[in-house]
């Protein structure tokens, strides 16, 4: 298959500062304890209005008033996820005054009670996802086909990783694999992608926190007669509880991130698990408005704008390596971004 992977052009996606900034309005907006804490919370993740009400124990009308002030000052953005509206901090160039205001603001942590409420919200999100997968493992493959069949993106994920592995060996001046290479797939589903990738690695590991999902994947592996699956291991593990041992060369998450309670926490964990110059590859939905994805497939997020994924990656030391977009199907468009863990190069003396 001829390569369709385009290197990512960082210059065209740099944060841009508005032509006119109302610094007075920004300063006034930040100069309120509750609004300052809202911005601190939004530095961690995106939250819905009712989630922010819970975090700060504030009634919805009052909180909406504060959010309006922050948005009018240009300090926050909002996006719709089905019937819910989520807020996040606006992005500014690193050397800009608003970025300096955010940095100063973040020197003071969120109050302990608010942090505890944030953890409660993450737990609720995770339980919602876990409950769906536990109760729908037997029909999820069929329902996922209605959103995006795996055969749509698998060839591109395989190609992305093959090119990365080849360039890594070339950069290290290797003619063959000398070290043990390990792949981790998060939420392997029916294990079709895992089986397609396994031949590129010494070890291919798939993890899921749902035993019913693992059982379904194991059944599919046992019936797979076209691929060598001897080096594949399936493990019942929580992605966020894996030891931070930087032991994986490549991490793959295909149609998984939109189920995660916190995209930012996902990227933080990936950073801890990847080896130097390791690769994260996502197959993920672009933003959409089809609420049926939540009921059919248990989606928490209705896709992601590429710049949102790039911001999460950059915050956690991951650099965009390539970006692909596949043709729209069933009303959904798939993106396949890859991110490389940036490591400092030793200085030559």
Mark where each language-model region is.
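Amphipathic alpha-helical dimerization/coiled-coil segments
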Residues: 5-9, 96-142
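N-terminal helix-turn-helix DNA-binding core of bacterial DNA-binding proteins
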Residues: 21-62, 85-92
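Conserved alpha-helix/loop element of class I SAM-dependent methyltransferases that forms part
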Residues: 148-179
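Class I SAM-dependent methyltransferase SAM/SAH-binding core
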Residues: 184-241
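A short acidic, Gly/Pro-enriched loop at the edge of an enzyme's catalytic core
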Residues: 240-251
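A short SAM/SAH-binding and catalytic strip from SAM-dependent methyltransferases
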Residues: 250-262
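A short glycine-rich, Lys/Arg-flanked "PGG" loop and its adjoining helix->strand segment in the class I
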Residues: 264-279
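C-terminal alpha-helical "lid/dimerization" subdomain adjacent to the S-adenosyl-L-methionine
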Residues: 279-338
């Amino acid at each position: 298959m001829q390569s369709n992977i385009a290197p990512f052009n960082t210059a065209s996606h740099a944060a841009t500062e508005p032509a006119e900034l109302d610094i007075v309005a920004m300063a006034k907006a930040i100069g309120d304890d509750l609004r300052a804490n809202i911005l601190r919370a939004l530095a961690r993740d995106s939250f819905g209005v009712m989630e922010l009400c819970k975090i700060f124990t504030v009634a919805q009308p009052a909180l909406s008033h504060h959010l309006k002030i922050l948005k009018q000052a240009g300090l926050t953005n909002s996006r719709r996820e089905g019937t819910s509206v989520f807020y996040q901090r606006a992005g500014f160039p690193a050397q800009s005054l608003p970025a300096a205001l955010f940095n100063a603001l973040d020197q003071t942590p969120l109050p302990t009670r608010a942090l505890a409420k944030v953890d409660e919200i993450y737990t609720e999100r995770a339980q919602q996802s876990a409950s769906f997968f536990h109760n729908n493992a037997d029909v999820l493959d069929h329902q996922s086909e209605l959103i995006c069949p795996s055969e749509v993106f698998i060839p591109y994920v395989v190609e992305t990783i093959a090119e990365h592995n080849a360039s890594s060996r070339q950069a290290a001046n290797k003619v063959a694999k000398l070290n043990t290479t390990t792949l981790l797939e998060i939420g392997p589903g029916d294990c079709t992608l895992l089986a397609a990738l396994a031949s590129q690695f010494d070890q291919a590991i798939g993890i899921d926190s749902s035993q019913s999902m693992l059982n379904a994947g194991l059944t599919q592996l046992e019936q797979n007669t076209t691929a060598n699956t001897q080096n594949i291991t399936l493990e019942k593990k929580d992605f966020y509880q894996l030891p931070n041992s930087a032991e994986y060369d490549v991490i793959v998450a295909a149609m998984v991130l939109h189920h995660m309670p916190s995209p930012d926490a996902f990227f933080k964990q990936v950073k801890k698990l990847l080896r130097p110059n390791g690769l994260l590859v996502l197959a993920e939905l672009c933003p959409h408005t089809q609420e049926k994805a939540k009921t059919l497939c248990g989606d928490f997020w209705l896709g992601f704008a590429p710049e949102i994924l790039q911001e999460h990656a950059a915050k956690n030391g991951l650099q965009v390596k390539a970006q692909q977009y596949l043709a729209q199907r069933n009303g959904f468009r798939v993106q396949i971004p890859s991110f490389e863990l940036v490591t400092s190069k030793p200085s030559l003396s």
